[in-house]
């Protein structure tokens, strides 16, 4: 029954009111999240209404608005308008034009207004209509109906709606569809891989092996998570299969398995040592060694690929201390991209191939920097306190996850490619680290 409800919810979004309404003279409100001067918008939430005009609902409707508010607090380009600032309150006569009074929201400084209508009431199994209006012009940005809504599915409805809203405003909506794989400390010499939504929901443990898991990586198809694993006896490649919920541990000759990373074709790059120093190897779809990707007398670790698989960022000690390099997988050319500092590690290339985030040791500690491949310049995007490390670009090439102990314990934080105020991802008790983004198919 629950499976059918989920299918109805996401496959049956039959009622689409409008998408990106606009004219040649005045298009819909949009935000450029990639340009240097990122703008922001003020957004207000109207009270959810039932079938009787001017009468708010008090059950699932209130909960859904709460989940939406919680989600939108993670978007730095949206500022939520305090309901107390709206003269006349947030309860309107209707939830769609012309029965909505946008003037009160406009006076409170809102650029956008979200309305929620429950034509059959908000009992389990009903449907909700969600719309977004421009406060000034009254234009509809978009609207959708979500059917067969149940209490347990409300977070999913909020995620889907917020993804649609972000896509309408920015052109990208992957953030709310993403899932982070990360490592959580669970006692002495015990670390396992966990999953969590970037807003902190759906927290769950997926491995339970003796020893320590490190550096998880999602496959592009959302089926596998690979990770480094070591116990008292050996190092190995761990593989979790989402379809079977099984974990296997794969050994290789040598004693080191470091930083596995999926390529766009679902093959894996990983650092293995068969001699003195580790080199980067390609594994096939059966996780068997296929060929070398980068070999050098020095240490070569931490591969990271763009969405095309033609660019590989990695860390190497070939110039003495660890530095970040870029390899053109078509020509084989290798270029150093960490221009300053004596200790630069843990690169993460953005899927669009334009940026590389990495950890730099500075005079004030380890910090996250972003190198721009176009302008060939770098900028600092995290500022502590404590130790900031292990950056990871999201599928939208906008958000970055990283690990920090600024509050004492290791925790996961989100920031954007531009920097800004970090937002902590709730992961429960225990140290959390090595966050990596993935997309699970709906």
Swiss-Prot record:
Q: Where in the cell is it found?
A: Periplasm
Keyword set for this entry? Answer: Cell cycle, Cell division, Periplasm, Signal
| Major subcellular site | periplasm
A biological process from GO: protein import
SUPFAM superfamilies according to UniProt:
DPP6 N-terminal domain-like (SSF82171), TolB, N-terminal domain (SSF52964)
Give one Pfam family. Answer: PD40
GO CC annotation terms, alphabetical: periplasmic space
Entry keyword annotation includes Transmembrane: no
Where is the secretion signal located?
1-26
Q: Which NCBIfam families does the entry mention?
A: propeller_TolB
Hey, which family's this protein in?
Belongs to the TolB family.
UniProt function note: Part of the Tol-Pal system, which plays a role in outer membrane invagination during cell division and is important for maintaining outer membrane integrity.
Oligomeric state and interaction partners are given as: The Tol-Pal system is composed of five core proteins: the inner membrane proteins TolA, TolQ and TolR, the periplasmic protein TolB and the outer membrane protein Pal. They form a network linking the inner and outer membranes and the peptidoglycan layer.
Question: What's the protein name?
Answer: Tol-Pal system protein TolB
Q: Which organism is it from?
A: Nitratidesulfovibrio vulgaris (strain ATCC 29579 / DSM 644 / CCUG 34227 / NCIMB 8303 / VKM B-1760 / Hildenborough)
Q: Which gene encodes it?
A: tolB
